[in-house]
Design a protein with these regions (language model features):
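Short, Lys/Arg-rich, polar N-terminal cytosolic tail immediately upstream
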Residues: 1-16
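A short amphipathic helical element positioned immediately N-terminal to and/or at the very start
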Residues: 8, 12, 50-56
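Membrane-water interface segments at the C-terminal ends of transmembrane alpha-helices
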Residues: 17-47, 58-174, 203-223, 251-253
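Short amphipathic alpha-helical coupling elements at transmembrane boundaries
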Residues: 50-54, 101, 134-138, 179-187, ...
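Short coil/turn motifs that cap or connect alpha-helices
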Residues: 95, 190-191
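Glycine/proline-centered hinge or cleavage motifs at structural transition points of membrane proteins
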Residues: 188-190, 202
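Helix-loop-helix "hairpin" substructures at the membrane interface of multi-pass membrane proteins
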Residues: 194-195
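Interhelical loop and adjacent transmembrane-helix boundary motif
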Residues: 223-254
Length: 254
């Protein structure tokens, strides 16, 4: 009995030592990751109040509205472009399905600002699309003759670039959940349309929202595309305050 308890105490001591090492390592890693945030919060309370009131009166409302409007637009189109193709690829078999599945991932390989520049140039007045319609179908040329450097078009382009985040998570979730629950609902006489919205979508919410979260983070940190479109967001405001105006305090507040 004495040997048993001695061995038990020794084992507990070893596990306790290992747990302490893991805890200390986790705390050290967390401090390293959170250190920039702590520094920003520390600097936030040391900036001049005049810059804060200038920011509030002249810039903050515009930055806030544009940022949230762009988030809403991109989220809506990303969910649309991500969930529906994932559903079709998962539940239907057709020719070229595997090739289409690979193609739907490719927008992640293209930077958002390059996609925004390319599409806006193609659709511009001197671009190939409007030039083609002016030369061949004059009556339809006015349909495309518009200013595309607008926040609505930017939200659509960013969704075309970022929807694979939602497509990937939705595709995996539909593959794992789809067959079992869809077969059960089919046996109960429920249509595929109702099963999709009432069963599969609610069960796949965690996966969908995880992809949507990544989309939102990408929209918030995007600079090149919003700068090219001339849309004032928090990111462009930070760059303008820090590098153009040399006002680090206002950049930190943003």
């Amino acid at each position: 009995n004495s040997n048993f308890w001695q061995n038990r105490l020794e084992i507990n001591r070893i596990f306790l030592l290992q747990n302490k090492r893991w805890i200390l390592g986790s705390v050290f890693l967390a401090i390293i990751l959170l250190l920039p945030i702590f520094i920003l919060f520390g600097e936030l309370f040391s900036v001049q109040e005049s810059s804060f009131f200038y920011l509030w009166d002249n810039l903050l409302i515009d930055y806030t509205f544009n940022t949230f409007y762009l988030l809403i637009l991109t989220s809506f189109f990303s969910l649309l472009f991500g969930i529906l193709p994932a559903w079709l690829i998962t539940n239907y078999k057709f020719k070229g399905r595997n090739i289409l599945d690979v193609i739907l991932y490719l927008p992640l390989a293209i930077p958002t600002y390059i996609m925004a520049f390319t599409y806006s140039d193609m659709l511009s007045y001197t671009g190939p699309i409007q030039s083609f319609f002016r030369n061949n179908f004059v009556e339809f040329s006015t349909i495309f003759n518009r200013d595309y450097l607008q926040i609505e078009f930017l939200g659509l382009l960013m969704a075309l670039s970022l929807y694979p985040y939602i497509y990937t998570s939705s595709r995996v979730s539909f593959s794992l959940l789809g067959s079992n629950y869809m077969d059960l609902s089919k046996n109960l006489g429920v249509s595929k349309f109702k099963s999709f919205f009432k069963i599969l979508i609610p069960l796949s919410r965690p996966a969908i929202f995880s992809g949507l979260f990544l989309v939102l983070m990408e929209v918030l940190n995007e600079y090149g595309a919003v700068k090219y479109f001339g849309v004032n967001t928090y990111t462009t405001g930070i760059f303008r305050s820090w590098f153009s105006m040399g006002d680090i305090g206002t950049a930190i507040q943003l």
